[in-house]
Design a protein with these regions (language model features):
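Proline-aspartate-enriched helix->loop->beta-strand connector
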Residues: 131, 135-140
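Conserved beta-strand elements of the Class I
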Residues: 73-77, 111, 139
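Structural beta-sheet core signal
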Residues: 76, 141, 242-244
Length: 343
């Protein structure tokens, strides 16, 4: 038997492992039923003074059966762009709630269902397995960017949760009962890291990663997901509106640090894919697939002419940017309530 490594050496290996896989932090991407992951329920966000709610989302309390005091209930589903903010009131959903209370009274409530790195399929699963039973008046789905950029950096399979390849590797590493002793890897951080990166390399080869065909498959899977959401919306019990989120590639003039948000190669890819997604939204509307309980809006250019430095990376924005988004969502709520009343 090999001598056991000293504790300090083992700790060094763990630190290296966690450093290499910091984007899989279980505190912000904790396993969740149906949706792959959300925040770790009731845990405090790192270096922040707020906690996730009992479901792993950024609310002061998670929604339950709707009380009579809630005269308006709005759900905002999305990714980490909804998590940004010093306190709930500083997030996009929190700022939206403030605006809706001014328009509709104290009974207006907005709930934040932003999960860091969530893609559209995960958002659909959340709506159909949890949210549709909670009597919302309006559901917003703010997304698009994660479906585009995460296959570039993480799991290359279009429409998959970004860390699925790592989950597959972990499951096979620990729970594959068919492996014989001579086939099993030594239980170590080094072997696990090699297994995960090896699977990623294999998947990239199998999917023709970063090829033209692969780019179009990313768009195709996103379009299929949107169409599924459209078909499901009739049974959700509340109008659903998909909003294509803003991206730095749609800003005409990038100010200060905005100019260094990402590499030129990646920004060119993001620009191509956003153009294609915009065309997808146009086709849905032209084909009559975005009407009634399911509608779509393109908010990607909401900051196009803004001369302020608003983006902190390719999709996250400053507090000023979050306020612009919240104001726009308040207008969207007003429009959806009118359409719902007419319908």
């Amino acid at each position: 038997m090999a001598p056991r490594a000293p504790d300090d050496a083992e700790h060094a290996r763990r630190r290296k492992f966690l450093r290499d896989f910091h984007t899989f932090d279980s505190n912000i991407r904790f396993p969740a039923p149906y949706t792959q992951f959300a925040g770790k329920p009731l845990s405090q966000a790192a270096e922040q003074n707020w906690r996730y709610d009992a479901l792993g989302y950024r609310n002061d309390s998670h929604p339950e059966a709707r009380p009579a005091s809630e005269t308006l209930r709005v759900f905002v589903v999305g990714d980490s762009t909804l998590v940004d903010g010093q306190v709930f009131a500083d997030t996009i959903p929190g700022r939206l709630e403030t605006g809706l209370k001014q328009r509709h009274g104290a009974g207006a409530r907005v709930y934040n269902f932003g999960a860091t790195s969530a893609c559209l399929n995960q958002m659909i699963a959340l709506i159909t397995t949890r949210l549709m039973d909670l009597q919302p008046d309006v559901i917003f789905v703010l997304g698009g960017a994660t479906d585009i950029f995460q296959p570039w950096s993480f799991d290359p399979r279009a429409g998959y949760p970004y860390n699925h390849f790592a989950q597959e590797s972990l499951c096979d590493y620990f729970f594959n009962t068919a492996k014989k002793d001579e086939d099993a890897e030594d239980l170590s951080y080094d072997s696990l890291q090699a297994l995960i990166f090896g699977r990623l390399d294999n998947l990239r080869a199998l999917t023709n990663w970063q090829s033209d065909i692969w780019e179009w498959e990313v768009v195709r899977q996103f379009e299929l997901a949107l169409k599924r959401l459209g078909r499901l919306s009739g049974g959700i019990g509340a109008p659903v509106r998909f909003l294509l989120q803003p991206a730095i590639v749609r800003k005409s003039e990038r100010i200060g640090d905005e100019q260094n948000a990402a590499s030129g190669e990646f920004l060119a890819y993001l620009d191509r894919q956003y153009t294609r997604i915009e065309q997808v939204l146009g086709r849905l509307e032209a084909d009559g697939l975005a009407q009634g309980p399911f509608t779509v809006r393109d908010l990607s250019r909401i900051f196009e002419a803004d001369t302020r430095a608003l983006f902190t990376d390719i999709v996250h924005v400053t507090s000023e940017g979050r306020q612009v988004m919240a104001d726009r969502l308040a207008d969207e709520v007003a429009e959806m309530l009118v359409l719902s009343a007419e319908g």
